[in-house]
From Swiss-Prot:
Gene for this chain: ynfB
Species of the source: Salmonella typhimurium (strain LT2 / SGSC1412 / ATCC 700720)
Family: Belongs to the UPF0482 family.
NCBIfam families linked: PRK13659.1
Pfam family, one: DUF1283
Record's keyword terms, sorted: Signal
Domain of life: Bacteria
Annotated protein name in UniProt: UPF0482 protein YnfB
First and last residue of the signal peptide: 1-28
Length: 113
């Protein structure tokens, strides 16, 4: 009986020791903290690459913005022309929505109201 009791105590002690060692090793791994100034060669290189990419796409962004501006200006001008055409004193003038022009009913030619 003494033999089994000593085996149990030994086994319990070994399990406790293993648990303590495992727990402390886990804490040791998670408690590492590395503080960098953020001014490493790698971060400078990444920043330079990002800036270069931003500059490369700049002309594309400008083209997209210019195109959007042109489309808006065209729609705005067409809206104004439609209003002028519909309010025109010329009874033969009508607005053609497909071509966005004011046309003469008799001749089909463009009219400037």
């Amino acid at each position: 009986m003494n033999n089994t009791l000593s085996k149990r105590l030994c086994l319990t002690a070994m399990l406790t020791l293993a648990a303590v060692v495992y727990t402390t090793s886990a804490f040791a791994e998670t408690s590492k903290l590395v503080i960098e100034s953020g001014d490493s060669a790698q971060s400078r290189q990444e920043a330079a690459m990002e800036k270069e990419q931003w500059n490369d796409t700049r002309s594309l962004r400008q083209k997209v913005n210019t195109r959007a501006e042109k489309e808006w200006d065209k729609a705005d001008a067409a809206f104004d022309n439609r209003d002028k055409c519909e309010q025109s004193a010329n009874i033969n003038a009508y607005w053609e929505p497909n071509t966005l022009r004011c046309l003469d009913r008799r001749t089909g030619r463009v009219i400037t109201p």
